[in-house]
UniProtKB/Swiss-Prot annotation:
Keyword line: Lyase, Pyridoxal phosphate, Schiff base
Residues engaged in binding D-ribose 5-phosphate: 30, 159, 257, 278-279
EC assignment: 4.3.3.6
GO terms for MF: pyridoxal 5'-phosphate synthase (glutamine hydrolysing) activity
Keyword field contains Lyase: yes
Task of the protein: Catalyzes the formation of pyridoxal 5'-phosphate from ribose 5-phosphate (RBP), glyceraldehyde 3-phosphate (G3P) and ammonia. The ammonia is provided by the PdxT subunit. Can also use ribulose 5-phosphate and dihydroxyacetone phosphate as substrates, resulting from enzyme-catalyzed isomerization of RBP and G3P, respectively.
Protein name: Pyridoxal 5'-phosphate synthase subunit PdxS
Pathway linked to the protein: Cofactor biosynthesis; pyridoxal 5'-phosphate biosynthesis
Record: active site: 87
Organism expressing this protein natively: Thermococcus onnurineus (strain NA1)
Binding, D-glyceraldehyde 3-phosphate: 171
Reactions that this protein is recorded to catalyse: aldehydo-D-ribose 5-phosphate + D-glyceraldehyde 3-phosphate + L-glutamine = pyridoxal 5'-phosphate + L-glutamate + phosphate + 3 H2O + H(+)
GO BP annotation list: amino acid metabolic process; pyridoxal phosphate biosynthetic process; pyridoxine biosynthetic process
Family: Belongs to the PdxS/SNZ family.
Length: 335
């Protein structure tokens, strides 16, 4: 099993969310081999994400990006004492089952890899291992939480070294939560109905192909064995919890475009619980220094003098990409 042995007899929601809380306030770094994993651990990372390539290289290589080779993940698991996460393609249940059997500590159902299912994300409640998923807005976040995600992260635009999309996603979620808090419960239920609509895409497409009316029957399953009304009720319950808390009910990390200590500090200043760093560490000129600096920036996010000091003599950050010039927008994957 993974380092923390958190997936005992049954992976309850409490256990899964408990693991996510254990990494709260920290930095999770993408690594592609044992040496990088050790650098991340020594720099103070709370966890590492095992990949075959960092997002910048996945973007550059093109083609179909899949789960990392098992040997690579095992090599990384054997190299460190901190928790190890790994990515699967959106909707790829079999990849997730393989990683669960391998004993990773958390699975990232990630838009960085090529999606496997054009209609649905994995029903994460069927697994013992906890999941993290990306979200651009509150609707995506609530859907992933209802499906069983123990942790949410911004999608940002991975592999760009450009923080703008992560900032966009943080603001979209935060401002939508503030709007929810001003709504009546009846209005919140209407939002739940709107947020549930993506689960109807497959059923509607089948009806269109078959020449049938678009209307979905109340007792008709549309996602696994769940009907549309059951999904709406589930999303409504989560939205009411969000309304009460004033935030997501799970740990919420920033990801996608973090490339400097100041980027990491900005995400924490905007209310994030921690930071994922993908290409920003090992595409910089001095990965060891950059890794330590970003960890320190997250620890001292509200101390500008400390951020200034740790930003000295850390070399060049990764080369950034302008979002409008991208041919492929990874953040648009998933529903």
């Amino acid at each position: 099993m993974g380092k923390l042995h958190v997936i005992e007899a049954k992976g309850t929601e409490r256990l899964k969310r408990g693991f996510a809380r254990m990494v709260k306030g920290g930095v999770i770094m993408d690594v592609t081999n044992a040496e990088q994993a050790r650098i991340a651990e020594e720099a103070g990372a709370v966890s590492v994400m095992a990949l075959h390539k960092v997002p910048a290289d996945i973007r550059k290589a093109g083609g179909v990006a899949r789960m990392a080779p098992i040997e690579k993940i095992q090599e990384i698991m054997d190299a460190v004492t901190i928790p190890v996460m790994a990515k699967v393609r959106i909707g790829h249940v079999a990849e997730a089952r393989v990683l669960e059997a391998l004993g990773v500590d958390m699975i990232d159902e990630s838009e960085v890899l090529t999606p496997a299912d054009p209609f649905f994300h994995i029903d994460k409640r069927e697994f013992n291992v906890p999941f993290v998923c990306g979200a651009r807005n509150l609707g995506e976040a609530v859907r992933r939480i209802w499906e069983g995600s123990a942790m949410i992260r911004t999608k940002g635009e991975a592999g760009t070294g450009n923080i703008v999309e992560a900032v966009r996603h943080v603001r979209l979620v935060a401002d939508n939560i503030r709007l929810i808090q001003r709504m009546t419960d009846e209005q919140v239920y209407a939002v739940a109905e709107k947020f549930a609509e993506p689960y109807l895409r497959l059923a509607r497409q089948i009806r269109e192909i078959s020449g049938l009316p678009e209307q979905i029957l109340e007792n008709e399953p549309v996602y696994g064995h769940y009907t549309y009304r059951e999904i709406v009720d589930g999303l409504y319950k989560i939205l009411l919890e969000i309304k009460k808390l004033g935030r997501l009910p799970v740990v919420n990390f920033a990801a996608g475009g973090v490339a400097t200590p100041a980027d990491a500090a900005l995400m924490m200043q905007m209310g994030m619980d921690g930071v994922f760093v993908g290409s920003g560490i090992f595409k910089s000129s001095t990965p060891e220094k950059m890794a330590r600096a970003i960890v320190e920036a997250v620890n001292h996010w509200d101390e500008p003098d400390v951020i200034a000091a740790i930003s000295k003599e850390i070399g060049e950050p990764m080369k950034g990409l302008e979002i409008e010039e991208l041919e492929v927008r990874l953040e648009e994957r998933g529903v």
